[in-house]
Amino acid sequence: MVKIRKDLVSSSVIKNASYGYGNPKSHIVIHETANQKPGADAAAHARLQKGGNSRAASWHYTVDDKEIVQSFPDDVKCWHSGSAYNSKSIGIEICVNSDGRIRV
């Protein structure tokens, strides 16, 4: 089983890239990164979030075929699925390999 590695963003990133705390976690939303560049793994996407990612998007976990990285605490309301679900869901991004395949 793959372990979850916590690499949490700072409080300033939480303030600037989320709706803050209070997520009741009633849903799970899964997306793919759509990033097929070499090296675009879970660790790279976690680093993107720690830097305050310029996409105005945030999510809780990034998954690749080697690891799972948690970037935001579960009770934070991340920006990943529109206003209807941001406030009540855990966001997961699945990395895409350079051949376009998803392996988890």
Positions of PLM-derived features:
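Long, well-ordered alpha-helical scaffolding segments within enzyme catalytic domains
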Residues: R55, K88-V104
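N-terminal catalytic cores of peptidoglycan-degrading enzymes
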Residues: M1-S83
